[in-house]
Amino acid sequence: MNQILNAQRLIQLSQFHPKLKNIWYLVAAATFSVCNEPQEIPKLYHYAMLLSNDNAHMYRFTLASQTIDLLRSELPMRKTLINENYQQPTFFQKQLTAKFREVILKTGPLAGLPRAINGLTMLKETTPDILVPHLDPIDPWEAAMGNSSPLSETSMRRKHDKTIQERDHTIQNGLRHWNSIYNKVSTRVVNNLNSSYPDLWYYTLVHVYGPLFAFDEILSAQETSLVIIASLVPQDVNPQLRGHLKGALNIGCDKETVEAVRGLAILISQWCGVSWKSGVVKL
């Protein structure tokens, strides 16, 4: 499998722009996932985990090299080393792990479920065992007969809507999030989707914006907005990217941060061999 990130590039990403100090790794993870380079995600994850330690900024190059060496080791030894490094993960490291998962999940409807599956699988294989949820196996055959649950509800971060009222609440959250992003053009964009195919708007609202994009218990609304921009940059979809660049401003991101996210996603896309038909739209 092609290897794109080395120690020097990890440092380059981490120092790309001061405004991205606490989100560069999430922006990068989304971009690599969309570019179908999931093998790079563990490097971002472990480098960000190591940088969270006290005084880590003083040893950026050493930690970047350690990250590359760790993930280059053979699988049994690699897993042992990972578990030894994180016997007592900090609150921030637990939070960081959850954010990486959430970022990749949110790329699913933007770039395709298969790529999100590949990214989350690669992340799981290099996550310390202590930070991997311990779940009872799901039996889809029994669940299809109504004899067991098809969901690990106690471990899910999202609440499973069991009543009409709960479903309506999720949809309303999705609409509020949508209106915050699209603002003055919200009505026009909704009716453009609806007139293209009513089921397109239904899917967008009920299955994407409601339960996924509006969910802010792991990523903030601003973080989600920036991750969406990073996910759109490699795909040569300027109409959608233009809307989300403006939407990020509407939802509270400052212009310099939005432009930095766009720039970082372009750099990573170029590393991945992406080309664009007519350039990448900007604010």
UniProtKB/Swiss-Prot annotation:
It is found in: Peroxisome matrix; Cytoplasm, Cytosol. A motif (Peroxisomal target signal 1 (PTS1)) lies at residues 281-283. InterPro entries: AhpD-like, CMD-like, PTS1_Protein. It holds the Pfam family CMD. The keyword Signal does not apply. Disruption phenotype: Impairs growth on oleate as well as on the non-fermentable carbon sources ethanol and acetate. Leads to increased level in threonine, serine, valine, isoleucine and histidine; as well as a reduction in citrulline, tyrosine and phenylalanine. Keywords: Cytoplasm, Peroxisome. One of its GO terms (molecular function) is peroxiredoxin activity. One of its GO terms (cellular component) is peroxisome. Its main location: other. The keyword Cytoplasm applies. Probably involved in peroxisome formation or maintenance as well as in amino acid metabolism. Present with 1890 molecules/cell in log phase SD medium. Belongs to the PXP2 family. This is Peroxisomal protein 2. It comes from Saccharomyces cerevisiae (strain ATCC 204508 / S288c). The gene is PXP2.
